[in-house]
Design a protein with these regions (language model features):
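Feature recognizes metal-dependent phosphohydrolase scaffolds
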Residues: 1-165
Length: 165
């Protein structure tokens, strides 16, 4: 989060309940787990889809897993804040009860520019205070960068598709 640029950058998404400062605080909790002497335990139990709803009272591995899922996997959620991690397609392909994370009501990051990726099927998304820059390099499409020290200016280059192994 760069307050002077009014910009928050995340890999995937931010739950509607988190503001930029809380997002950074929670990301640091995961960073500490990765740097800590129990990092192997954290990584061993990292992958999972529960808990799927934020609560400030979450603790331990459940808390770290939820934070990690939001910041690295989140694409969709429900109006009550439940994650929809199974869906990976572009908006419109998901079940009707799910919304893109950035369209959920009450989003506490709505007043800052959020730059995110991890959604190749979405493609380039430019809205007021929202910039999705995953343009599908992994699929042989484009790699996109953005200049943030002013109005968002994007730059894209063609990628080569990596053969399946």
């Amino acid at each position: 989060y760069r307050p002077e640029l009014n910009t928050l950058m995340v890999h995937a998404g931010v739950p509607p309940q988190w503001d930029p400062l809380l997002t950074i605080k929670l990301a640091r909790e995961v960073e500490q787990a990765l740097r800590g002497r129990h990092c192997a335990e954290y990584i061993r139990d990292l992958y999972g889809e529960q808990p799927d709803r934020w609560s400030p009272g979450l603790t331990g591995q459940d808390r770290l897993r939820f934070i990690t899922n939001c910041l690295t996997r989140m694409r969709y959620g429900t109006v009550d804040g439940t994650l929809g991690l199974q869906e990976t397609g572009p908006p419109g392909s998901q079940p009707g009860y799910l919304r893109p994370w950035f369209d959920l009501q009450g989003r506490q990051t709505a007043m800052v520019r959020v730059v995110f990726g991890h959604w190749a099927s979405l493609g380039l998304l430019q809205r007021d205070n929202l910039l999705g820059i995953d343009t599908g390099c992994v699929w042989g499409r484009k790699l996109t960068a953005v200049r943030l020290d002013g109005p968002a200016k994007t730059y894209s280059v063609q990628c080569h598709k990596v053969p399946d192994t």
